[in-house]
Amino acid sequence: MAVTIIFTVMYFLLFNTGETWERVDVDTFEQSMEDNPDAFLLDVRTQAEWEQDGHLDGAVLIPHSSLEVRADELPGDKDELIHLYCRSGNRSVDAANTLIDLGYTNIVELKTGINGWKNADKPVQYSE
């Protein structure tokens, strides 16, 4: 019994780093954006996808493969809320991990990506 408790405590100490990364559905993502209108909204798709498929109003485009080299474009406060999305929810997982590696601690990621957002008939913007 004592061994189990020791391993449980060790696991918690080793793997609980305090980072917050939450994968949410469309409605929860939308509610979080409404509740936190000043949060940083990050689109990690490509420029071509941004232009072709539209984007969420107010989003900043930084492709997931460029996050580390363009880190100066991210919020200076590592605890600031970041709303994060990609096309389908795959690249945003990689991007969330990169953001955590960069020290960010408060990330809400749209698990269905913009595809799920559009399928739910939510609004998107198109560049002119």
Regions found by a protein language model. Give the residues of each.
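Rhodanese-like catalytic fold shared by cysteine-dependent sulfurtransferases
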Residues: 1-32, 38-40, 47-81, 87-128
